[in-house]
Each structure stands twice: as C-alpha cells, then as structure tokens.
C-alpha cells in the first residue's frame, strides 16, 4: 500500500517571516503522516524554520534543489550533506524550471539522485513533456526516456523508495490541467518503465505524483486514479487554507 504524498512546491516565494506565519496557520491541522504524507519544498532560506516546525508536526521538509557533490568550491550551490544534517527529508530534482532556465540535464539529475540517497534523503524526481511533444505524440517515449536516464545505476531499493513527479510542462502555471485520465495514462507509463528497468515489485512501491495546476477542486479526482499517489503543487500550496484542503482531501 503506497502512502499518498502531497508536496507543496513554493518555488522562489516566502521569506522566513512569511514561512512562520504559514506554519502557524496549519499547526495541528495536518493529517497523520501514515494516512497522507504532507511535504513542503521551500527556498533554502526557509528550510531551518520548516525543519524546526516539523519536529512536532506531521510535516516533512523538502529542498527545491541540491548539488551532486557534498562540499567544495561550488559557489551558490546547496550541499546535500548539509541538507541531511539540517534534518531535510526530500529534495526536488529535475523540475522543468531547473531544466529550462538553468540547463539541467538528465545526467545532472541522475548524479543528484545518487548524492541525495548517499546522504539519507529521498529525491522527488520530476519529468514531463512540452506541448509540442504532446501534440506530436511523443509524450510516452519522452517521459520514459527521462525516467530511464534519471534512475541509471540506482539500486532497486533506492528506486522503490523514490518519488517521481509527472509535471506536463504545458500545464504548469498556465491554468491548463491535464485531465485526470491524461495524468493517469502518463503515470501508468512511468510505473511500466520502472517495471521494465527493475521489476513489478519495485514499480508497485514507487510513489508517483502529478504536478500541473493541482488545486483543491481537482485533487480528489486525481488521487482516485490507480497510478497517481500524490501531487506536486505549486501556486495552490502558497495559501495555508488551500494547502490544508489539499492534504486533507480524504476528509
């Protein structure tokens, strides 16, 4: 049985004071982590505030990126070793914005995934296609390729523990949402790809999120699909009431 995982991705929003105000508003209102795992991915400057809060609450913390080396002369990068020592649980890697604006490659993402596991955290590995690729009928092949490259040389145990987020680029921040059937179709392809690379047992354990204009209004329908185990939520996670509606979608 896969535990649902709803993760808010704040992107480059909220300072530490705004973070504390958000946390004060959700205090004591999150579901038990055994029912739905609630996660917030936040800018590095907010992580210490989140980690301190999470010690007494049903919340897990995620960084929005990390480097693939533990330390060294890499100005501006975030050390996975330091994130782990800080108490961070997850790291989002391969987000379409990182790929588009910062030139991240599948090889970079694979190296980051290994570094995250080596530092006892779990990657949330993002994948997804552009509108042009979808209209050309290339979605399944493209996403399967991204997953194959991202998981290269990871152990079966590591892959089983991973979270994979399908985020159709054409549905991020555009107001367009993949229908629940479209989202399920690609999430099924992701699970099939993992089964081919490893085996069905591993594929049945990996948790797959959908990310692309997820809101309280559509979360229950998405979560009703067989291969969708969670959401990676952008804008709708910035408001505490909206975030609470999302993580408490079961009622």
UniProtKB/Swiss-Prot annotation:
Q: Any idea of its EC number?
A: 5.3.1.1
List positions binding substrate.
9-11, 173, 213, 234-235
| Pfam families on file | TIM
Q: What class of enzyme is it?
A: isomerase
Q: Which UniProt keywords apply?
A: Cytoplasm, Gluconeogenesis, Glycolysis, Isomerase
> Which top-level group of life is the source organism from?
Bacteria
Sequence similarity: Belongs to the triosephosphate isomerase family.
Described function: Involved in the gluconeogenesis. Catalyzes stereospecifically the conversion of dihydroxyacetone phosphate (DHAP) to D-glyceraldehyde-3-phosphate (G3P).
Q: What's the name of the protein?
A: Triosephosphate isomerase
């Amino acid at each position: 049985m896969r535990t649902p995982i709803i993760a808010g991705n704040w992107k480059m929003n909220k300072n530490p004071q705004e973070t504390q105000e958000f946390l004060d508003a959700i205090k004591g209102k999150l579901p038990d982590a055994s029912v739905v795992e609630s996660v917030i991915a936040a800018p590095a400057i907010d992580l210490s505030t989140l980690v301190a809060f999470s010690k007494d609450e049903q919340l897990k913390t995620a960084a929005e990126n990390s480097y693939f080396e533990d330390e060294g002369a890499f100005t501006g990068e975030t050390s996975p070793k330091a994130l782990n020592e800080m108490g961070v649980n997850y790291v989002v890697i391969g987000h379409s914005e990182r790929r588009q604006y910062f030139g991240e490659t599948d090889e970079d993402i694979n190296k980051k995934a290994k570094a995250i596991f080596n530092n006892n955290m779990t990657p949330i590995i993002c994948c997804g296609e552009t509108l042009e690729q979808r209209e050309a009928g290339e979605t399944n092949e493209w996403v399967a390729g991204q997953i194959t490259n991202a998981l290269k040389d990871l152990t079966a145990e590591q892959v089983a523990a991973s979270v994979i987020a399908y985020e159709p680029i054409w549905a991020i921040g555009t107001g367009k949402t993949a229908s629940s059937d479209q989202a399920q179709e690609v999430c099924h392809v992701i699970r099939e790809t993992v089964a081919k690379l490893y085996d069905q047992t591993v594929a049945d354990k990996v948790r797959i999120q959908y990310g692309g204009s997820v809101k309280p209004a559509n979360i229950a329908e998405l979560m009703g699909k067989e291969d969708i185990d969670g959401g990676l939520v952008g804008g709708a996670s910035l408001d505490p009431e909206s975030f609470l509606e999302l993580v408490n979608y079961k009622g």
